[in-house]
Amino acid sequence: MPKMKTNRASAKRFKKTASGGFKAGQAFTSHRFHGKTKKQRRQLRGTAMMNKVNVKRYAKILSNL
């Protein structure tokens, strides 16, 4: 049986938390801020947590993180 390999594209985007979840940078933050409200820009500052539905699926893809 071959070794499980980590998906490298996903590994660059997600970090595993101590509780077993995954966090990533927010989308929609690279350009075109003039079309976004102050509230939107403020809320996009932090990192986003992956929802629990996707954590099981990504746990296999990112098994070695």
Swiss-Prot record:
Pfam families (UniProt xref): Ribosomal_L35p
GO MF terms held by the record: structural constituent of ribosome
Record-level GO cellular component terms: cytosolic large ribosomal subunit
Any Gene Ontology biological process: translation
Keywords in alphabetical order: Ribonucleoprotein, Ribosomal protein
Domain of life: Bacteria
Residue segments, region Disordered: 1-26
Cysteine pairs bridged by disulfides in the record: none
InterPro entries (UniProt xref): Ribosomal_bL35, Ribosomal_bL35-like, Ribosomal_bL35_CS, Ribosomal_bL35_sf
Annotated TM spans: none
Family indicated by similarity: Belongs to the bacterial ribosomal protein bL35 family.
Protein name per its UniProtKB record: Large ribosomal subunit protein bL35
Organism: Oenococcus oeni (strain ATCC BAA-331 / PSU-1)
Gene responsible for this protein: rpmI
